[in-house]
Curated annotation (Swiss-Prot):
Protein name: UPF0164 protein TP_0548
Family: Belongs to the UPF0164 family.
UniProt lineage: Bacteria, Pseudomonadati, Spirochaetota, Spirochaetia, Spirochaetales
Signal sequence region: 1-37
Top-level division of the source organism's lineage: Bacteria
UniProt keyword terms in alphabetical order: Signal
Length: 426
């Protein structure tokens, strides 16, 4: 059986202005003197180890560093879940599993290094997901110049940012196969990514691709929801090349394989695990564990921890839901992908929109016909219940509760016939 409930949406209009204001002001706050002073000591101590080897040093870092959303706070452990607009960086199969479409704006600040602005769109039509994401990044000195501040930075150029400035564009497509009621199917997705970076001495054009698999299930779930509570994922990331525009020198990126698992045993709690291993260079795997706490209908807390050899990363954030808008913000300390400047802050605003096609309307019809059968079954009108559930199966052959209900109703009908025959004989 399924349980259906309708929740009245609160009025969100007065709070939306505050959400947009917070989003608009964060780039200024994150690049201000106050935030820099708060992390200056820690950044200085971590910078002393910047010559050490870490995965990001020889890579197009914007392909490795999260830019916002749940991926920012869960990291590699988000590989299996991949259920918001940050799935582009975690698992390209995520778009086929979105319960609603999303338009998202993210601001990410890597203190003393760079700032990234991201616009993402993702939607699902029937079993096919698609989307696009564009992010622009610039050094801290460029942002200060834009706001009229001193662009000189440190004398040693510490504020110029290792990545310089540029952009990354991602196109995504995915599809779900063999979807049923409890087993939601296996999704396959791919990303095509292109980036441009202009540094102090060189410019790079980078082209890469991702491939991802994602499976979702409903397993031992003790709360009412049609959404799956268990996910597994497998991803091949960043298979591609980078070309220096000045010398036309071609370099291969360092692709990686990531696997993930996520499980929500109760409504209020979800945990996730992730493992990522590079393929062309001998490096320790990145191991990650993440947690989500659904405190109320409107507030969710997220946290994760990751390690790679002697390096580690810690992150935490909060997600606030106001009607069709989700606001998230948080902090991440990351020595794994950028040891020289490990402090990151981010904020995001997501607008949830209906998915395309007639899938939502079809799902509503399926539920209504199933509930009609339940009412007949409760009234012991078993033949009418069977007829209603047969209609449910014609609308959705994979709706398993209807098939199970038909089987139970037929058993009761046979039992009723035997009892009637026994009464006649006596």
């Amino acid at each position: 059986m399924i349980s259906c409930s309708v929740r009245r949406r609160p009025r969100w209009e007065p709070q939306v202005g505050a959400a947009f204001l917070a989003f608009a002001l964060l780039p200024v706050l994150a690049s201000g003197r106050g935030m820099q002073a708060a992390v200056a000591t820690a950044a200085g101590s971590s910078g002393s180890g910047s010559d050490g080897k870490h995965p990001g040093k020889e890579q197009f870092l914007q392909f490795l560093i999260p830019s916002g959303g749940r991926y920012e706070y869960l990291g590699v452990s988000f590989t299996a879940l991949a259920d918001d607009a940050s799935f582009f960086e975690a698992n390209p199969a995520g778009s086929a599993g979105l319960s609603r479409g999303e338009v998202a704006l993210f601001h990410h600040s890597q203190i003393h290094d760079s700032h990234t602005e991201t616009v993402s769109f993702a939607r699902r039509t029937q079993n096919t997901g698609y989307g696009a994401s564009v992010r622009a990044f610039s050094s801290e000195s460029d942002l200060k110049s834009f706001f009229g501040g001193n662009s000189g930075g440190n004398k040693n150029g510490g504020h110029q940012g290792k990545q310089g400035k540029g952009f990354v564009a991602i196109a995504n497509a995915s599809h779900t196969f063999c979807g049923q009621y409890r087993f939601k199917g296996v999704s396959f997705g791919c990303n095509f990514k292109m980036g441009f970076r202009k540094g102090k001495t060189d410019s790079h054009v980078t082209v890469a691709g991702d491939l991802g698999l994602r499976a979702a299930f409903s397993v031992a779930k003790n709360f009412g929801s049609n959404e799956p509570n268990m996910h597994v994922g497998l991803v091949l990331k960043n298979a591609g090349i980078s070309v220096k525009t000045n010398s036309c020198q071609v370099e291969h990126l360092n692709p990686a394989i990531a696997v993930g698992f996520a499980y929500r045993p109760v409504y209020a709690f979800l945990f996730s695990l992730g493992l990522q291993q590079t393929l062309t260079k001998r490096e320790s795997p990145v191991c990650s564990v993440g947690f989500m706490f659904f405190c109320t209908q409107h507030v969710t807390l997220l946290a994760s921890a990751a390690c790679e050899g002697g390096a580690y990363a810690l992150s935490g954030g909060a997600e606030i839901r106001i009607g069709s808008f989700h606001l998230d913000m948080g902090y991440r300390y990351d020595q794994i992908f950028q040891a020289a400047h490990p402090h990151h802050v981010s904020v995001g605003l997501k607008w949830l929109i209906p998915n395309g096609g007639t899938q939502a309307d079809q799902a509503l019809l399926v539920k209504e016909s199933y509930l009609v059968g339940l009412r007949f079954y409760d009234q012991r009108r078993y033949q009418e219940a069977i007829t209603a559930w047969q209609l449910t199966l014609r609308q959705d052959p994979g709706f398993e509760p209807a098939a199970e209900g038909i089987e139970r109703a037929r058993r009761f009908l046979k039992l009723h016939e035997k009892l009637s025959l026994f009464d006649i004989l006596n």
